[in-house]
Amino acid sequence: MAKRVHLFDWHKEHAKKIEEFAGWEMPIWYSSIKEEHLAVRNAVGLFDVSHMGEIYFRGKDALKFLQYVTTNDISKPPAISGIYTLVLNERGAIKDETLIFNMGNNEYLMICDSDAFEKLYAWFTYLKKTIEQFTKLDLEIELKTYDIAMFAVQGPKARDLARDLFGIDINEMWWFQARWVELDGIKMLLSRSGYTGENGFEVYIEDANPYHPDESKRGEPEKALHVWERILEEGKKYGIKPAGLGARDTLRLEAGYTLYGNETKELQLLSTDIDEVTPLQANLEFAIYWDKDFIGKDALLKQKERGLGRKLVHFKMVDKGIPREGYKVYANGELIGEVTSGTLSPLLNVGIGIAFVKEEYAKPGIEIEVEIRGARKKAITVTPPFYDPKKYGLFRET
């Protein structure tokens, strides 16, 4: 049976399409993907992302453990703030892209992908129990995914909405900084973060879940529902729209963000013989702190020496056509790779995508062809984001 988020009943009543995603029954859209997408780019949208995973690490050795099992420098963010980091396997392949918050007092909160949190929790628990260097650590690992409702408020009007709801200016917070806030007596964690390319914030509310896999923990999500409805009510004057996973995907793609399961994954089987993806191939080396040891480091160093073989690149269609996952990519008549994500940009009304291609083609300004329904259509590789960052996104000037 598919998993369900705290507010599944609300979504079932209001969403036009609900579909299984990564093992969860989730709202795909309420009005339309395009309408919700443009609301986020031009005003503000509200997403229920409670399917994302949450894992707590507590104890005086929590930092030591996280430094070894993730790639970035987890000692860097002060309390309360976060850092983007990766979890790799021994071969250097990406198990997941994660966000880790230093909560203070030797406590850390990891946010991970919806279809990876169970795998990661099992992996971390296994390491702690079986690897000699970890067995005696002062460390508690707790899975909290089903106990936390997570909402994302995204768009240029998110700043105004945060001020109205919580009396704070999120623009005075750095990206991934967090703080405790209250709304009508309900305490929650708020972070300046998001997955759309726009300014925004995300809130984490611990509450009962009527669909919790542990029946003894089931209950009505009164706090989460109250916060969700208050955000929608307060956001009416800014044109807020509830937005589903359809718009979340087109927004992240316009911003050029990778998606676990498409661009980053263990054992990613593509027709171009790419079986696993490393941070070097996925343009994620910025999330690696080389001045420490971590699982997968040796494999990455060896890959650097021998070459990457394949690498991610972003592209925009020149000819009419919508690229989709699995479509083949050519250059000069040669098969060079395969599309990992593709869509028709709701903002630009042009086909855009991300592909794995031979390393020498993974740079902007290269003319390529994408095979769409049996015909090869012209495209060109570009530097993300796909939109004009002076007009849209976190650093817009207007």
UniProtKB/Swiss-Prot annotation:
InterPro entries associated with the record: GCS_T, GCS_T_bac, GCST_C, GCV_T_N, GcvT/YgfZ/DmdA, GcvT/YgfZ_C, TrmE/GcvT_dom1
One of the record's GO molecular function terms: aminomethyltransferase activity
Alphabetical keyword list: Aminotransferase, Transferase
Pfam family, one: GCV_T
EC number assigned by the record: 2.1.2.10
Class of the enzyme per the UniProt entry, highest EC level: transferase
Keyword Heme: no
The UniProt record lists the keyword Transferase: yes
Catalytic activity: N(6)-[(R)-S(8)-aminomethyldihydrolipoyl]-L-lysyl-[protein] + (6S)-5,6,7,8-tetrahydrofolate = N(6)-[(R)-dihydrolipoyl]-L-lysyl-[protein] + (6R)-5,10-methylene-5,6,7,8-tetrahydrofolate + NH4(+)
GO terms under cellular component: glycine cleavage complex
Gene Ontology biological process terms, A to Z: glycine decarboxylation via glycine cleavage system
NCBIfam families membership: gcvT, PRK00389.1
Family under the similarity heading: Belongs to the GcvT family.
Function according to Swiss-Prot or TrEMBL: The glycine cleavage system catalyzes the degradation of glycine.
Quaternary state and interactors: The glycine cleavage system is composed of four proteins: P, T, L and H.
Protein's recorded name: Probable aminomethyltransferase
